[in-house]
Amino acid sequence: MPIVSTFDDVRFRPACATDAQAVATLHAASWRRHYRGAYSDAFLDGDVVQDRLAVWAERLGSPLPEACTFIAERDGVAVGFAHGILGEDPTWGALLDNLHVADGLKRRGVGTRLLTLVAQVVAERTPSSGLYLWVLEQNTDAQAFYAARGGICVGKEFAVPPGGDPRRLNGAPMKLRYAWLFPSKLLASA
């Protein structure tokens, strides 16, 4: 796992169990900001933080050997995180399951650094693997971010409802698959 690094007063490190609340809070805030319309208002306006906390307490409390999670902090406050899962798909490779950055720190390199940290783990542990992610079709800012870093849109499917509960979706939103066949190229551009 990469060592702790710092730039522009932001510290990057592997996440641990004690980060679950901070990660859940960031995750919920990002969903509320970017997924409104695709996810139901009842779900987003409800206790989505508690929903995400259950997920992150499990992921960070009992991490899988094929998973990696990084957190970005500024002045001791979590401002971003990324979570990857190695070998998730036989065709596309490792899954970047989450990448979220607090609104105030977007376009400052935090997301790029988090993406690079996951790509570094992929390159070190599964060097012949690709890297991919899913992004909601309505999240055009994220699509532009990934495309600017060499991600290619290679597929489109219906979004899976959070927690498998279809009431959490509005209609049938679509998600797009972005992929990097050679994630090591992300390291060269970092």
Language-model region placement:
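Acetyl-CoA-dependent GNAT
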Residues: 3-10, 14-18, 25-38, 42-106, ...
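Active-site-adjacent beta-strand anchor residues
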Residues: 13, 135-136
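A generic structural signal for beta-strand entry/edge sites
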Residues: 91-93, 130, 175
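Conserved N-terminal glycine/acidic-rich loop preference
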Residues: 95, 114, 141-153
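Short amphipathic helical patch at the helix-1/turn junction of helix-turn-helix
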Residues: 101, 136-137
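Conserved GNAT acetyl-CoA-binding A-motif
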Residues: 122-134
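Conserved catalytic-core motifs of GNAT/GCN5-like acyltransferases
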Residues: 132-135, 147, 152-177
